[in-house]
Regions:
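Conserved glycine-centered beta->alpha loop in an early N-terminal alpha/beta scaffold
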Residues: 1-138, 209-210, 215, 288-291
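Phosphate-sensing "switch" segment of ASCE/P-loop ATPases
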Residues: 269-271, 286-385
Length: 467
């Protein structure tokens, strides 16, 4: 078993009708006493020095004769370049090429239905997830494509187009936001109706550790809460900002030497996948943070509960579809790279508002590339006709751009007087300040932003707003 530069040996021992298995380093393999301990003292122990020498000779002879199989293991799932070719590795092996001796050594397990791979019903099961919310189909279409995008994280990164945003699913209590997010994102550990991968009440260190193991998949972080306690709120917001910046910048996080040594992990922890956050609130202030998040809003009643129950009961629908999708990407990797580069060139040549941050433009390019790849897959497999694929592609592109432009419009920096007015409006609604109305006060509804500069004047003591 090769784990980067470390080599471990897995030894199977048959002794007195019982089977024992041990994995350790070579020095352990040649240690006569330790190997005997593996058998719970059932093996006959010959204590003479010649016997021990013969044992070591026997082990060395097995190795020299090559009477073993070699297996290579990675500490994360996802795309690895193996023998010059990109391949997607999971704990059960390489997707699409199960005979290759490569696996990931992770706690999260990949399970799927082999007999349903490339099946029309499997595709339609996934495709119809877009209908989980007919009230806000834009949101569920975005989640569907974000789920597909996540399994290509490394490929986008390889081309210099890192997926530099996270998705936040924000909704009121009982809006089914967590359940909805789970059916779209839970690629691993699908044997039960599992909870989120991790929650915001976990430590920052625990959350950030997850970011490096979920390669080319989505890490779901649940339960962003509106704390009344200012200390808890500040702590949670600090963790939130760190998560958003990590995924937005995709810079490796450095661990301490001591932590790395104790836990046998690398000092540098790269962000390998995508992230979806769920919660009731999302209070972001800095522009640099706001532009790294695409927010999807859900309310109670937006999700079709009957359809949601179907996907909660059919746990293997998502990973079985993804097995087929990833296999297609593996077989057509050069075309996938071409589509990504081509979409970036096309999108960056379009006209967008002059004050629109490049992050939002690149987000459109990233999602556009995924949409094109998805419908290329659907058409090539015969799941959709050429006409049908083009119609859905156009519809999904409009949905995606609407959401991104909506996030841009809500995030753009306003002029100072507009920000003052927005702050005053919030303070009045929350009854944090009282309002004095002058006799000539008029209704402020419907004021245009371009008129704001002519409405506000300041003296040493007062802020005067003229209707």
């Amino acid at each position: 078993v090769d784990i980067k530069e470390e080599t471990e040996w897995v030894v199977d021992i048959e002794c007195m009708g019982r089977h024992f298995k041990v994995q350790n380093k070579f020095s352990f393999l040649c240690d006569y006493n330790k190997m005997l301990n593996v058998t719970a003292d059932r093996a006959y122990q010959e204590i003479s020095a010649p016997a021990k020498r013969e044992f070591r000779k026997y082990v060395n002879r097995l190795i020299m004769d090559g009477k073993f199989t070699t297996e290579y293991r990675y500490k994360s799932t996802g795309w690895k370049k193996i023998n010059g070719k990109w391949r997607y590795v999971t704990d059960i092996g390489v997707i699409g090429e199960p005979t290759l001796p490569y696996k990931s050594e992770t706690d999260h397990k990949f399970e799927f239905a082999p007999n349903l791979v490339d099946d029309l019903n499997t595709f339609m099961d996934f495709f119809n997830m877009r209908k989980l919310s007919e009230e806000k189909m834009r949101n569920t279409v975005f989640l569907m494509h974000y789920s597909c995008l996540s399994v290509m994280t490394t490929l986008f990164q390889e081309l210099g187009h890192g997926i530099n945003f996270v998705v936040a699913l924000i909704g009121t209590t009982n809006s089914q936001k967590t359940a909805t997010a789970t059916v779209f994102t839970r690629l691993y550990n699908r044997t039960t109706k599992a909870n989120a991968d991790i929650r915001f009440d976990s430590t920052e260190a625990a959350i950030l550790e997850k970011t490096s193991s979920y390669g080319d998949s989505i890490l779901m972080i649940d339960d962003l809460l509106p704390y009344a306690d200012s200390t808890l709120a500040k702590q949670q917001n600090g963790i939130l900002r760190e998560i958003i910046r990590n995924y937005g910048d995709r810079l490796p996080r450095m661990r301490s030497k001591l932590f790395s040594k104790i836990n046998n992990v690398e000092r540098y922890s790269p962000v390998r996948g995508c992230c979806l956050i769920t919660g009731e609130v999302l209070n972001l202030e800095e522009e640099s943070t706001v532009t790294r998040v695409i927010q999807l809003d859900f309310e109670r009643g937006d999700i079709n509960l009957r359809r949601l129950s179907y996907y909660q009961d059919n746990l293997l629908s998502l990973p079985t579809f993804m097995y087929s999708y990833i296999s297609f990407i593996t077989e057509n990797i050069e075309n996938i790279f071409y589509i990504i580069q081509d979409e970036f060139a096309n999108v960056r040549n379009r006209e967008y508002p002059s004050n629109m941050p490049r992050r939002f433009v690149d987000t459109i390019a990233i999602m556009s590339a995924e949409i094109r790849i998805f419908y290329t897959y659907a058409e090539s497999k015969g799941f959709l006709s050429s006409v049908g694929a083009q119609q859905y592609k156009k519809e999904d592109q409009e949905f995606i751009e609407y959401i991104i432009m909506k996030n841009f419009n809500e995030a753009q920096l306003e002029n100072p007087t507009a920000k003052i007015l927005a702050s005053l409006k919030w303070a009045i609604e929350k009854e944090k300040i009282s309002v004095y109305y002058s006799p000539e006060e008029k209704c402020l509804e419907g004021i245009k932003s371009e008129d704001i500069d002519n409405m506000v004047t300041m003296t040493d003591d007062l802020l005067c707003i003229r209707p």
